[in-house]
Amino acid sequence: MQVYLVGGAVRDQLLGIDSYDNDWVVVGATPEMMLAQGYTAVGKDFPVFLHPKNKEEHALARTERKSGSGYTGFDCFFDPSVTLEEDLIRRDLTINAMAMDDSGQLYDPYGGQADLNNRILRHVSDAFVEDPLRVLRVARFSAKLASLGFTVAKETMQLMRDIADSGELNTLTPERVWQEWHKSLSTPRPDVFLSVLRDCGALAVVLPEIEALFGVPQPEKWHPEIDTGIHTLMVAEQAAKLSTSLPVRFAAQVHDLGKGVTPESEWPSHKMHCHTGLKLIKKLCERVRVPNEFKELALMVCEQHSNIHRAAELKPQTIIKILNKFDVWRKSERLKDILICCQADHAGRKGLEDLPYPQAGIFMLAYQAAASVDVQAIIQDGFKGPAIRDEQEKRRIEAVKVALNK
């Protein structure tokens, strides 16, 4: 039997970037041989084993044949006679279809290294169209590698359009959609994930709420880019520059969903979008099973980002009311995340990317002043029961007045 390092680990090694997961393929072995050498069987649908020492996954070389619809409709065949080339051809992209043996010898039967050097994401074979999940995977790899100059090959993009047109994307479970979206949020360019999905027609199928933003105008005075969809991509890019927090990056992408349902008669104004967006975010998060941590931050950003942009105009009591809604007294780190989203929204406008965002400083100063109010001093002053909270509110408002010179 021969063991090869395969897939992303080989790709990343050749690119000179860190790889955290090693995947191995074993040629010429049977399950019995693996078990005899101390490996532990873990695969349900096909034979995957954990190494006895490092616990890394080792899969027996296999072939796949389409037998039904969707990304699960495959029959797998594994046997000691399956070659490395036969195993690699079933993979999605040429850059993921390379292998390396323990001596460092590279095996590249499908031109992955050439595509790596030319910064091309290209399908290995026409069997690419048999798995609709690959559309999302290619979009994610585009986001992961965009900063290195990678683009999708024209022929591959056409196959992705064919998949989108076929209806096969509807077979993807909500969990798989979220899994790929979630992974894309940790890439250097999460916005590219969305733009590639849109280019092939998949965004309208898997994330129609975001697709609905494209072609919707905003006031040119505030948004030189005009198109809400383009603005959303710009905000997504800015959020990734400002924060590594995945909930922050998610909230930035969905904060303006309400603009997608503004009646055309009201364009380019979107006076109610902070309100109408809440329902859309809730439905989206429910549909694709988004964790509560992501949903809660997105809802707060959606509801209050326009108010935060007007920080200099707000009365101290209004600022305290907003801080209360954020529950910052118990979750102080939340305010920073919300303000980063608002800063990304502010910077995600054509030609205005480098403008300062003093609103964040105003809110942080107000919070620090209000948080300094000592509840023990209120109690010592003789306040009891509900009166303690009322007095605390008054003193917080007064502290903000002093801090902001209002």
Swiss-Prot record:
GO terms assigned for molecular function: ATP binding; CCA tRNA nucleotidyltransferase activity; cyclic-nucleotide phosphodiesterase activity; magnesium ion binding; phosphatase activity; tRNA binding
Residues reported in the UniProt entry to bind CTP: G8, R11, R91, R137, R140
Domain HD per the UniProt entry, residue ranges: 228-329
Cofactor requirements of the protein: Mg(2+); Ni(2+)
Amino acids binding Mg(2+): D21, D23
Catalytic activity as recorded in UniProt: a tRNA precursor + 2 CTP + ATP = a tRNA with a 3' CCA end + 3 diphosphate; a tRNA with a 3' CCA end + 2 CTP + ATP = a tRNA with a 3' CCACCA end + 3 diphosphate
Pfam families found in the cross-reference section: HD (PF01966), PolyA_pol (PF01743), PolyA_pol_RNAbd (PF12627)
Keywords tagged on the record: ATP-binding, Hydrolase, Magnesium, Metal-binding, Multifunctional enzyme, Nickel, Nucleotide-binding, Nucleotidyltransferase, RNA repair, RNA-binding, Transferase, tRNA processing
Disulfide bond in keyword set: no
Positions with a binding annotation for ATP: G8, R11, R91, R137, R140
Biological processes per GO annotation: RNA repair; tRNA 3'-terminal CCA addition
UniProt cross-references to PROSITE patterns, sorted A to Z: HD
Record InterPro entries: CCA_bact, HD/PDEase_dom, HD_domain, NT_sf, PolA_pol_head_dom, PolyA_RNA-bd, tRNA_CCA-adding_enzyme
Record's keyword annotation contains Transmembrane: no
UniProt-listed Enzyme Commission number(s): 2.7.7.72, 3.1.3.-, 3.1.4.-
Cofactor binding description: Magnesium is required for nucleotidyltransferase activity.
Top-level taxonomic group: Bacteria
Record comment regarding domains: Comprises two domains: an N-terminal domain containing the nucleotidyltransferase activity and a C-terminal HD domain associated with both phosphodiesterase and phosphatase activities.
Family membership: Belongs to the tRNA nucleotidyltransferase/poly(A) polymerase family. Bacterial CCA-adding enzyme type 1 subfamily.
Miscellaneous remark of the record: A single active site specifically recognizes both ATP and CTP and is responsible for their addition.
Biological role: Catalyzes the addition and repair of the essential 3'-terminal CCA sequence in tRNAs without using a nucleic acid template. Adds these three nucleotides in the order of C, C, and A to the tRNA nucleotide-73, using CTP and ATP as substrates and producing inorganic pyrophosphate. tRNA 3'-terminal CCA addition is required both for tRNA processing and repair. Also involved in tRNA surveillance by mediating tandem CCA addition to generate a CCACCA at the 3' terminus of unstable tRNAs. While stable tRNAs receive only 3'-terminal CCA, unstable tRNAs are marked with CCACCA and rapidly degraded.
Protein name: Multifunctional CCA protein
Organism per entry: Vibrio parahaemolyticus serotype O3:K6 (strain RIMD 2210633)
